[in-house]
């Protein structure tokens, strides 16, 4: 029953958030109240990190059926701790996917609201952020009128994850730093983001 309630809240939240980013706090609080919070359980943190490693940091998408099964299992298991964090991440990704599928731009207010919540909640539970949150937050801020905050987010992310190719790419795109460009074309010329943004 609990899984059904959480699933319903997730579906409801996506349709609500498509219209208004400010409604997220109310729905999220309901999801959080259903979640078992455990600062020592790293399953969700590790899933976020693995998603980053396989989908963003890797030269090419290295998502495997095994990882997808692991993610699905965590989402469907009512005993998964810190599920509220995983739901926020999935809401963000679903919103982006739905916008792309419909040929529309994602809602910047929604993206920023989700990532702000995910950032603060993840810090509260784990005391630190996985790299994927810095990247998604930078993307969210970049979609809205918060360009200076993008630079700050990327710089903070690079302090924690100096080898993060996606963060280096976003830093280069915002600063046009020649040393970063050289690093990317010398050390990561085949990375999908370097190629996507035509960094040469």
Protein language model annotation of sequence segments:
Residues 1-27:
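Bacterial Sec-dependent N-terminal signal peptides
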Residues 67, 111-114, 150, 184:
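Single-residue signature of alpha-solenoid repeat helices
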Residues 61, 104, 108-111, 146-147, ...:
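TPR-repeat structural position
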Residues 69-72, 119, 155, 189:
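Alpha-solenoid helical repeat scaffolds
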Residues 121-122, 157, 184:
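Canonical positions in the second alpha-helix
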Residues 128, 170-200:
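Terminal, low-structured helical/coil segments at or just beyond the last alpha-helical repeat
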Residues 25-62, 66-105, 126-140, 165-171:
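Amphipathic alpha-helical repeat scaffolds of TPR domains
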């Amino acid at each position: 029953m609990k899984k059904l309630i959480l699933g319903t809240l997730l579906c409801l939240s996506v349709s609500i958030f498509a219209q208004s980013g400010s409604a997220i706090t109310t729905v999220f609080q309901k999801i959080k109240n259903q979640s078992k919070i455990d600062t020592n359980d790293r399953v969700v943190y590790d899933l976020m990190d693995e998603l980053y490693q396989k989908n963003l940091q890797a030269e090419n998408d290295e998502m495997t059926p095994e990882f997808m099964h692991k993610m699905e299992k965590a989402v469907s298991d009512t005993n998964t701790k810190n599920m509220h964090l995983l739901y926020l991440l999935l809401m963000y990704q679903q919103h982006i996917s739905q916008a792309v599928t419909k040929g529309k731009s994602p809602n910047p207010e929604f993206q920023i609201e989700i990532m702000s919540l995910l950032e603060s909640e993840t810090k509260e539970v784990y005391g630190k952020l996985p790299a994927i949150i810095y990247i998604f937050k930078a993307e969210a801020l970049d979609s809205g009128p918060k360009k200076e905050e993008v630079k700050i987010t990327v710089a903070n992310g690079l302090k924690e994850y100096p080898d993060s190719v996606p963060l280096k790419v976003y830093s280069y795109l915002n600063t046009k730093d020649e040393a970063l460009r050289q690093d990317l074309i010398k050390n990561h010329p085949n990375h999908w983001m370097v190629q996507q943004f035509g960094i040469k």
